[in-house]
Amino acid sequence: APADRRGNLVAWNQFAIIFGMLVVYFVNYTIALQGDAAWLNTIGWRWMFASEIIPAVLFLSFLMFVPETPRYLVMRGRTEKALGVLSHLMDQADAGRELEDIRNSFKEKAPSMKPYFRFMGTWLALFLAGYGLLSWAGNTNALEIALLASFCIALLFPIRSFGVLIILVGVLLSGFQQFVGINVVLYYAPEIFKTMGAATDAALLQQIVVGAVNLSFTVLAIFTVDKFGRRPLMIIGALVMAVSMLILGTTFYTRSVGMGSLVCMLIYTAGFAMSWGPVCWVLLAEIFPNSIRSTVMSIAVAAQWIANFLVSWTFPMLDKNQYLTDTFNHGMAYWIYGVMGILAALFIWKFVPETKGKTLEEMEGYWER
């Protein structure tokens, strides 16, 4: 995509995801209205899962019409095909210049991946050793403790390759997108609303409101990401999420949940939708060098799913833990996500460059410097 429109075009991907989720919220709410709570727990949830067959078939069908990316085609020596794809996005002269930039970028020496594999080997060895010792000692949280501790220790090893630095920035960018707790809101919203005192039907309806806010502010990001840049949106969004989560946790702690708690969740969702939702994907599409983009993008996305798993797995533990519930009344988890929001803002400010208006080839030169 052209540098001046790339943020807008990539952000539409997030819009499509959120739009699909909002449709699912409506479908689930409609299914839930067909019976009582007992029916929903025995039969209704099966219909919710079965309804996903329709979009899955449509996705597979439309996937046949998606073209390969120009950079992939150039890497495979199919330059004429790459020029054809570029010509659909810009005029012939600009397409030719863009194609030449892409071809030149592949002539440059790729960053060495050896330090990355050395880092991953160190992390894996530390994880296996830590998990083995904790399991042998009978620790019930051995897996998550070993994962986090081994990664933090591995990060202490010196980084001698800018390729590894790029990978770590991508991995942490993906990780923070999940560690701020967004999928707790998206996955567990009905349960959170029930904790606030809402009935099942009302909780599903409030989830639709969350989805509508998510969609609306994603549209805002689409039309501002190329105007204001990536870094300002990401930093502001992280701070908005941090403040709203800290306040939400406080409403639980002080046993004053109500409309204010719902407003905090909506503000949090808006903060994510205007920043880390779409803009994180824009940055991931822009910061990696052409020569290793596909490999490193896969690593970053894998890190995102690992972080997603950790957050969605640990939230019920934090929320239902008897000691934490008695002491903080369900507030601890939200405070943790608030702190993660602050760390995410600091991470963007310190380590992530502004990519607005820069070609992907220019970004490769930035990392080399």
Spans of model-derived segments:
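Alpha-helical transmembrane bundle of multi-pass membrane proteins
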Residues: 1-90, 106-369
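Short, well-structured alpha-helical segments
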Residues: 95-104
